[in-house]
Amino acid sequence: MKTKLLLLPIARLLLAIVVCLPVWSSNMFAQTTESYAVLDNAAGTLTFKHDANKPAGAFSMNEDKTFPAWYDGDGTEYNKNNITKVVFDPSFANARPTNCYAWFFACKDLTTIEGLEYLNTEKVTNMNSMFSNCLSLTSLDLSNFKTKM
């Protein structure tokens, strides 16, 4: 009889643990999201993302008046000759960059920018030289940019 009485509370406890487990595990292992860019040299594509899956070799966003990290390793030469296409992944809509200084400066072979609507510019304070000398870029829709004077 005592065994039967103990089974009911134990069963309730186990049920409560199973029901709460997804909540506990999602909070225990929450990952930090971050903004980054990935350069695929073979395809000539620079892709911007904002998530918790930054791969090795991905570039962080630049701060202040410094050139972006997708310059080459020593910071003196740009991967500009490799970039023909820029893609803003839908995840980048959650990013809030504060600086776009020289993001595409002198990318003379850049012809296409996809997903520009996912670039939220409301916190950006510096867009200096963002598209300077993009000689092959023939059109650009900036209607989604939110800027203040």
What are these regions (language model features)?
Residues 1-32:
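Bacterial Sec-dependent N-terminal signal peptides
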